[in-house]
Amino acid sequence: MKQRTDRLILRMNTMTRKFSILQMIFIPLMLLFFICMNMGFVKYNDCVVVYSILLLTIGTIFCIWKFKDSINKPLSQKTYSKSLWGVFIVSFVIQTLVCMYVPLAYYSDFIIVREQAIHMAEDYSVMPQYDFYFHSYPYQLSIVVIINFLYELFGSYKGVEIVTTLLVNISAILAGLTTCNITGNRRVAIVVAILFEVFSTFCLKTYMPYSANLGMIFPILILYIYTTRMSRIWKVVCIALAVAVGYRVKMTTIIPFIAMVMFCGYKLLRERDLKTLIVGFASLMIFSYALSSIHNCMLEKMHFVNDEKIDHGFIYYVAMGQNNPTGGQYNHDLSVLADRPFPSKKDRDEYFLGKAIQSVKERSAIGQLKFFAAKIAFCWGETYIDHLYFCKYDKVLLIIKHYTWYLAMTLMVIGTFIIRDRRYYMLLLGIWGVIAYLYLSEAGARYVLMYMPLVYVMAGWVVKRLFIR
């Protein structure tokens, strides 16, 4: 008993030293971020997101470590259920009041697209006919479809906000349940749920667009399904369904799914698991194909179907920044082409290729490096490479860009089953993380908010390894 106590004290002392080191690294790192922000190298949102994640993660670990004695006390299932329901109800009421009475601070691009598209559709004849935006970003159109449906159902965007707030609260509870499944500690799960609710309330009217709210539930749902008690076959089928649905709502849902497969790679090396793996990927393909068919039918009903015969100039016109109140990245003056309802292929090739080159020249040295790194990685994010779709090799670039990403992810997953050395395995994870970041590019700042549950779960796992035996 004494030896065990001595080991625990030694572990606590080690944890204290590590926490002090983290604090020493944390403050200069944040100062560096804000200096870079003031110099224009990074966006304000990047600093806020990184700062919030580090602060909340370190704060969570510290609180759990500080109150570990009370946290380790058993908690009845009845009290646990009541506590989670209480957190859910109180947070939902508070966030609903915020949605109803606080002015909207972050206008979603998709809402602006919808409103402006309806407005411009009234004078469709003067709009340039492009078919870029929703051809290249079909998953974003899913957001427009969902928001449009909710808007028609409730009659205002307040109703849309309340529905997305409900999804955020459900995500928080799932984060708590997942933490309980991993750590086996109900008190830790309640703490995680509360912290997640506090963070989501802070972000509700500032840095969390509707698309993130709608997509947030899927990553944590995948983790919850994986950690819950269920037969392995049913588990992978449910995960495949969650990934398929989440992919249509928010494409980045696929990232935690791949991460989960990689982290669990050692467990899937055995031959008897091949059946489960095959069933899982087959289910994912079936669900994805079915949802893709349904999705295309919905787009046809909404007259957003995209092929060589149908144009959506007003949608693209807004997406590229004309009359865009957000002041987003697509702020190009389209007046040159506005008087040509049907510009030739040569006209738009020259115009947008020239704009892309001009944009690169105007960027700083750091910006150019990031641009070319993104170009090499064929990232999907909000970079100027998107405008290169209009050059004569647009289809080739699109195919290379997409399939390079899928090929890289496939190789990473396959590597999971081959590499057994932990050092190389962690290197593989690091490479995967870099590719994932380049894939998200500058848009990744706000998408990181979707993965706060994953951060909390990992924090819970660390606590379990350190203190809970």
Task: Briefly describe each language-model feature range.
Residues 162-183, 221, 410-414:
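Transmembrane-helix motifs of polytopic, lipid-linked glycan transferases
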Residues 297-385:
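Membrane-proximal stem/loop segments at transmembrane-domain junctions that anchor or position
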Residues 43-53, 159, 370-437:
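Membrane-interface anchor segments at the N-terminal boundary of transmembrane helices
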Residues 137, 141-145, 153-170, 190, ...:
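Loop-to-helix entry region of an early transmembrane alpha helix in multi-pass inner-membrane enzymes
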Residues 102-118, 122-146, 154, 158, ...:
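Extracytoplasmic catalytic/substrate-binding loops of multi-pass membrane glycan-assembly enzymes
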Residues 138, 159-167, 191-226, 249-256, ...:
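Multi-pass, polyprenyl lipid-linked donor-dependent membrane glycosyltransferases
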Residues 175-198, 424-428:
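Transmembrane-helix signature of polytopic, membrane-embedded enzymes
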Residues 1-97, 276-285:
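Start-transfer (signal-anchor) and selected internal transmembrane alpha helices
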